């Protein structure tokens, strides 16, 4: 059983956070939380999302599992104006999701969850560096790096106590340094890893510029990015595998 009413903004923000990595996913409909965990086809980027029942105007669920085509659901949600309410109800017999938006009614065929890629186990890494940064600074770094390269290095300099971003192209380079007074928080530890800029660009699309983003970094280790959505009623974690640099 699943029946809910949610604002268009909250639903769109939730779907966007996942669709930057995958086209389809499993959605767990627990009695107090909607949750999604998925990995992209190349097993490079992962997403773990929880949206509390309190993020909804109303929410009833009993532990079901559904599979959805994210692009189709996003298209439907995109028909709603900002602030409008969207009604969702699962028909368990037909395995279809009924969606109502201000008089418009849609019936979305669901996907067999067993046909969707297995959900990843996101490792509990004890990474040495922790950085809290504003979403707008991540956006600035990614945008600048994209002008010169297709990969980006993120790290922490423990000697100078700062977080840095490097991007090296064939002819041009980008370097950004942020000291503790330019960050929300910095727990310095040895960290330097190279990442695909394409993945970070996609993740960046879903990160609000006003969000506080917590980064966990290591030396040639995956990066974890944590941030809240839906007025802190939802939480997203991205994990991105590094590009291993040859000596």
Curated annotation (Swiss-Prot):
Keywords: DNA replication, DNA-binding. One of its GO terms (biological process) is leading strand elongation. Pfam families: PCNA_C, PCNA_N. GO terms for molecular function: DNA binding; DNA polymerase processivity factor activity. PROSITE patterns: PCNA_1 (PS01251). Signal peptide: none annotated. The keyword Cytoplasm does not apply. InterPro entries: DNA_clamp_sf (IPR046938), Pr_cel_nuc_antig (IPR000730), Pr_cel_nuc_antig_C (IPR022649), Pr_cel_nuc_antig_CS (IPR022659), Pr_cel_nuc_antig_N (IPR022648). Belongs to the PCNA family. Sliding clamp subunit that acts as a moving platform for DNA processing. Responsible for tethering the catalytic subunit of DNA polymerase and other proteins to DNA during high-speed replication. Homotrimer. The subunits circularize to form a toroid; DNA passes through its center. Replication factor C (RFC) is required to load the toroid on the DNA. This is DNA polymerase sliding clamp.
């Amino acid at each position: 059983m699943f029946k809910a009413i949610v604002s268009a903004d909250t639903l769109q923000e939730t779907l966007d956070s996942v669709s930057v990595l995958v086209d389809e996913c499993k959605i767990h409909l627990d009695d107090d939380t909607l949750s999604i965990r998925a990995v992209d086809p190349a097993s490079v980027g992962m997403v773990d999302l929880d949206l509390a029942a309190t993020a909804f105007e109303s929410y009833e669920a009993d532990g079901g599992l559904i599979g959805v085509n994210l692009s189709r659901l996003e298209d439907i949600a995109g028909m709603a104006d900002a602030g409008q309410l969207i009604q969702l109800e699962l028909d368990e017999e037909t395995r279809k999701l009924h969606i109502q938006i201000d008089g418009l009614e849609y019936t979305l065929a669901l996907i067999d969850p067993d046909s969707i890629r297995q959900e990843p186990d996101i490792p509990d890494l004890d990474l040495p560096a922790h950085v809290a940064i504003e979403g707008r600074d991540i956006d600035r770094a990614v945008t600048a790096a994209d002008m010169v390269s297709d990969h980006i290095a993120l790290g922490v300099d423990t000697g100078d106590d700062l977080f840095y971003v490097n991007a090296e192209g064939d002819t041009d380079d980008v370097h950004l340094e942020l000291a503790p007074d330019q960050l929300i928080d910095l727990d310095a530890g040895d960290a330097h890893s190279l990442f695909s800029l394409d993945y970070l660009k996609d993740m960046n699309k879903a990160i609000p510029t006003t969000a506080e983003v917590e980064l966990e970094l290591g030396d040639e280790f995956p990066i974890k990015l944590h941030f809240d959505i839906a007025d802190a009623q939802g939480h997203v974690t991205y994990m991105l595998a590094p590009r291993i640099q040859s000596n």
